Amino acid sequence: MSDKQATVLVVDDETRSQDALRRTLDEEFRVLTVSSADEARALLLRQPVSVILCDQRMPGLTGVEFLKEVRERWPEIVRIVISGYTDSEDIIAGVNEAGIYQYILKPWVPDHLIDTVRQAVEAQGLQGDMHRLDLELRTSTPVLRQRSSQKLASAQSAFNFERIVRAPGSPLDAVCEVAARVARYDLPVMVLGESGTGKELLARAIHYASPRAARAFVSENCAAVPDNLLESELFGHKRGAFTGAYEDHAGLFQRANGGTIFLDEIGDTSPAFQVKLLRVLQEGEVRPVGSPRWIPVDVRVIAATHCNLESDVHAGRFREDLYYRIAGVTISMPPLRERSGDLQPIAAKLLEQVAQELARPGLYFGGDALAAMMAYPWPGNIRELRNEIYRAVALSSGEEIRAQLFSRKVLHGQPGTVKRGPHVQTFPQSGTLQERLDAIEAVVLKEALLRHRWNKTHAAKELGLSRVGLRQKLLRFGLEEK
């Protein structure tokens, strides 16, 4: 992001939804809210906006109808629609009719929403420039060639292995050394690691260190998109292929032609989709949905997952032939708790970025804050650390960031009760049955609250409790956000 906060416009006729979206986003973005398409139009005429988050169900125009108008009048704005609809054809129709960047289904998850908006803001900047680089490189104008070269140099400077923050002697040194060697060769790469460890950052560094650096780098989170939409998004579709397909749509494989595609959370794809992806990788060609013709593509694939794919292959959850196709070289990103020496330089860099984005110069960590960060195991890795630093900066009144500004989970988190890897949880091995059940229940409650950023209404709904019932359990177990 730039040194200014990106502006996000929320269009929703329900005040509670507006408030929930604002609370989730306003620590990182400048959030504006309006209740109708008319109010949104008036605002867009007065000031620039980076991203629009629009609810699908509104009086008058639907969200898709309004965003279609936005696409025509303000095409530079990234458009995101939020809806409770679950029909795949409706989702695909909406995405393509209005050129929507992402479709988020209710109930949305705060961390996923924040990540989606971050990626949308980024799509306006450097990556948007890189997608236009191919065209500019083909022009004969020396000025344009020079500008394209400058953009490439800027991207290579922003996304290189040296820019991956770490301490001297970090375990990441070996990771980056292997990745730098692999980058030179046109091999598929599989990046393994927990959520928030920086897998996409490593993938970008590999791309910009490769012979494909001058061509596009595109990414897709496979876990965040329904199967039918994922097929259209990656492979494209023809006009009339399904309801709402009003024009031809080039998929991400075509956009990445000559470059690199990053497929995040590939382990969460369905067996049906895995078959289609395998065909594309084997033959080097894609067939858009509704088209009889195969289109050749030359794309390097970097995939990533938090899953143990070898176990999934043995269990029949992931195709063995696809696994060997995408895992030419496997690189593991260690979690933050296994590289504690990196925590302070990473935290310092994040604080510098947040201070710049929020116009708060001169911030620094107090000794107690550093001690608290070092004592906490960070199950959410760098993403969780970033969120905590945003929270602390937003709550701080002076230049020193103190430990008391961190959330309760950081101040009181116990290393023996956090996740050590995907789907792994440590529980008490002694005590009465009731004591053990109470310990498990407390962990389940805490994890639900963390997922929903301590929104008790959403957590209660997930757990099948009334809000009063959840409140009673929180009091019983002494769970309360500080």
From Swiss-Prot:
Q: Where does ATP bind?
A: 193-200, 265-274
Keywords, in A-Z order: Activator, ATP-binding, Cytoplasm, DNA-binding, Nucleotide-binding, Phosphoprotein, Plasmid, Transcription, Transcription regulation, Two-component regulatory system
Q: Which residues form the Response regulatory domain?
A: 7-121
* Cellular compartments annotated: Cytoplasm
DNA bind region? 456-475
According to the UniProt record, list the residues that bear 4-aspartylphosphate: D55
Q: Which residues form the Sigma-54 factor interaction domain?
A: 167-394
A GO CC annotation given for this chain: cytoplasm
Transcription listed as a keyword: yes
Q: Name one GO biological process term.
A: phosphorelay signal transduction system
A Pfam family annotated for this chain is Response_reg
Q: Which GO terms describe its molecular function?
A: ATP binding; ATP hydrolysis activity; sequence-specific DNA binding
Q: What does this protein do?
A: Probable member of the two-component regulatory system involved in the regulation of the hydrogenase activity. HoxA is probably phosphorylated by a sensory component (which could be HoxX) and then acts in conjunction with sigma-54 as a transcriptional activator.
Name used for this protein in its record? Hydrogenase transcriptional regulatory protein HoxA
Q: Which organism is it from?
A: Cupriavidus necator (strain ATCC 17699 / DSM 428 / KCTC 22496 / NCIMB 10442 / H16 / Stanier 337)
Q: What taxonomic ancestry is recorded?
A: Bacteria, Pseudomonadati, Pseudomonadota, Betaproteobacteria, Burkholderiales
